[in-house]
Amino acid sequence: MSHLKTSTEDEEPTEEYENVGNAASKWPKVEDPMPESKVGDTCVWDSKVENQQKKPVENRMKEDKSSIREAISKAKSTANIKTEQEGEASEKSLHLSPQHITHQTMPIGQRGSEQGKRVENINGTSYPSLQQKTNAVKKLHKCDECGKSFKYNSRLVQHKIMHTGEKRYECDDCGGTFRSSSSLRVHKRIHTGEKPYKCEECGKAYMSYSSLINHKSTHSGEKNCKCDECGKSFNYSSVLDQHKRIHTGEKPYECGECGKAFRNSSGLRVHKRIHTGEKPYECDICGKTFSNSSGLRVHKRIHTGEKPYECDECGKAFITCRTLLNHKSIHFGDKPYKCDECEKSFNYSSLLIQHKVIHTGEKPYECDECGKAFRNSSGLIVHKRIHTGEKPYKCDVCGKAFSYSSGLAVHKSIHPGKKAHECKECGKSFSYNSLLLQHRTIHTGERPYVCDVCGKTFRNNAGLKVHRRLHTGEKPYKCDVCGKAYISRSSLKNHKGIHLGEKPYKCSYCEKSFNYSSALEQHKRIHTREKPFGCDECGKAFRNNSGLKVHKRIHTGERPYKCEECGKAYISLSSLINHKSVHPGEKPFKCDECEKAFITYRTLTNHKKVHLGEKPYKCDVCEKSFNYTSLLSQHRRVHTREKPYECDRCEKVFRNNSSLKVHKRIHTGERPYECDVCGKAYISHSSLINHKSTHPGRTPHTCDECGKAFFSSRTLISHKRVHLGEKPFKCVECGKSFSYSSLLSQHKRIHTGEKPYVCDRCGKAFRNSSGLTVHKRIHTGEKPYECDECGKAYISHSSLINHKSVHQGKQPYNCECGKSFNYRSVLDQHKRIHTGKKPYRCNECGKAFNIRSNLTKHKRTHTGEESLNVIYVGSYSGTSQKRTYEGGNALDGGRMRMPL
């Protein structure tokens, strides 16, 4: 032991003395330098320093020599501790804080009479505790790279290897290099599978001694090393030191290839594999390799289905903690990553990095086959499948394969089965959550993808990508039949259906077929009444987004479509086109048969079919023929009852756009058709024609049956049905037939209960506008129809006609039983006596009546309202009979007296 000498501040102990208990020592390890129960704690040795007897250093050293010899001989006889275990402890000491390094390099030995405390090593053998020096020793050896100080030069030499990156020990199995032989020995156990260090608590085995020590702390549950920055606790001071670098930003381990720095050596080691291409960790299921064990561990969860990290907000589970943390930011609304160009925020840093490429225009990932470049590697990987023909995403139902996972997701929705992801707004279900998330943007109105050229927004990136081609002029999808090019694959696919004559998308409600799936989806909403596009201003809903877009202009006041003739502006292009027809313009295409002129040649061609008698378009339901496809399409809606044109003001629906156009003029007040005789204006051309017939000499078409004259031949043809008894318009509910479609429409409201015309004075509703017009005269007192016999006036023309029959003694309405009546309505009521029909039913008790007035009286028995005196006068064979209801007095006049 002559080589042991007194250590002063100016000299360094020899390596043998300095590294007692470490791998470099020639002596066997006397005791565990960091007892497992106190690893990383504020060491008990520190507290013992104050209580130590303050002997001269020389005296203590002499006493310690004998203790060391005794301890060494005991250690040799009781334990055979492997040198690599000690070496490992030595390596670990490089990462310990200075005070723990001091403890590890102290001379061994302490008087048992002073403390008497003993510590067990890993094998259970007890040795005396180490004695710490009383006076602190200055750290004179400083690293000129990072400024860290050491007491001994040998420590500094070992530390410098971190900066130089020198690794002299190479693994002959995988080529991995290490700074020390002990690290290489531990590494080789990865290849051999040897795990010599076993936990006596649970039996779990480890390759290295330090790993076992780390593991043992899980049983004790102690975390005695606390970070004074954030309060986080750790089992070991070395781990705490590494953690502190997060706060300080210190990254002492730098890559010699690219200069990237890391907080710890393991991070650098894994990073270097990027340059070397080394991936030593292989999945035993699919053969995929990884540069680090954690990557393999996470990957294996794909095969096992394990998702240990669950969100406590929504229950969604993830395979990594980081993915869970990223997901949680959705619930918190956190978007901490902000673009300094456009200030757009993102949940994840990776998304921000991808986004920034939009501003730089950088596309670093280039295809070596065709030269196409991409912003990210994933885009290139997917693109390469076009060249390789690889289709890794296979449908487990039908076996069809796809290049993209999104393609498979869309395809799977074709197969029937439960769709687990349901929209809470409208109840629509989806096979995948990603599709549900895309769908939800319909309800939220969220459009996060903005075109940097025109500012137009989109719900998804794919929509934006296709839209950008409008600005660039790129049309990558070309038809191989006619050469026409398109900006999207779906547009090309739809176009090809024209050549094939295909309309593959068939409505399951009315069997109507469409070229496009999108057109079918929109059409189906007519049947389902679904209106997913809601206005956030007034709550009004629409079947499609374009309808909502036009509607929103009502709130914003925007009118982008302006007439260049008069300057009038409109909210939609169709409104402008309709308006333009008011202005006289050039019509260069003239019909040589009737000299009628048209704006377009196509319109002229269609018109000529009228003269030729051609009606090539035939209805497959009723075989009626038409000149134009548009007329056939409109006609078909009679059979399907489809009314796709809806008014955005009052929600009234129409079979064709022209009817909607005319209807809208009620709301706008526009009356473009003016009478050249009296100046009165109307909303439709047909109304003007009808009006003109009131002027003398303006009715050239006369009925040869009754002499009644009409302005148009069409009106005359309709009128003649009265004489011929034709009633082509039949009600499907009750079978009743009518001469005019307008009468059928009014009649249908009896079955539907619809009364769209409401009096603004008393709230009474009517089935038709004429009923409302007559009713309003009750409030105004207006009676424009006066009898020229007796001067009595009436509010309606029909009432006057009925009254005149009293003077003439006529009762033109005869029943088969011989009774006659002045009024058709009275005859209809009378006939119900013979048929037994009682169409008026009480919704309280179900009792039925043959006339409405009886139902009205009956209802008062439920409401408790007092009965009114109602008089009904009917004539039988020229004799007038008076009936008094509820004991009321009979009134003259041949009409009912009703309270106002």
Swiss-Prot record:
What are the residue ranges of zinc fingers typed C2H2-type? 225-247, 253-275, 281-303, 309-331, 337-359, 365-387, 393-415, 421-443, 449-471, 477-499, 505-527, 533-555, 561-583, 589-611, 617-639, 645-667, 673-695, 701-723, 729-751, 757-779, 785-807, 813-834, 840-862
Which residue ranges have biased composition labelled Acidic residues?
9-18
Q: Which GO terms describe its cellular component?
A: nucleus
Sites of the Glycyl lysine isopeptide (Lys-Gly) (interchain with G-Cter in SUMO2) crosslink:
5, 48, 62, 65, 82, 92, 587, 748, 882
UniProt lists compositionally biased (Basic and acidic residues) regions at: 47-73, 83-94
State its location(s): Nucleus
Q: Which Pfam families match?
A: zf-C2H2, zf-C2H2_6
Which residues lie within the region annotated Disordered? Answer: 1-97
Can you cite a GO biological process for this protein? regulation of transcription by RNA polymerase II
- Keyword list, A-Z: Isopeptide bond, Metal-binding, Nucleus, Repeat, Transcription, Transcription regulation, Ubl conjugation, Zinc, Zinc-finger
**Cross-referenced InterPro entries:** C2H2-ZF_domain-containing, Znf_C2H2_sf, Znf_C2H2_type
User: In which broad location class does this protein mainly occur, judging by the first location in its UniProt entry?
Assistant: nucleus
A molecular-function term among this protein's GO annotations: zinc ion binding
Q: What does this protein do?
A: May play a role in differentiating skeletal muscle.
The entry sums up its family as follows: Belongs to the krueppel C2H2-type zinc-finger protein family.
Name of the featured protein: Zinc finger protein 62 homolog
- In its UniProt entry, the species of origin is given as Homo sapiens
Output the lineage of the source organism.
Eukaryota, Metazoa, Chordata, Craniata, Vertebrata
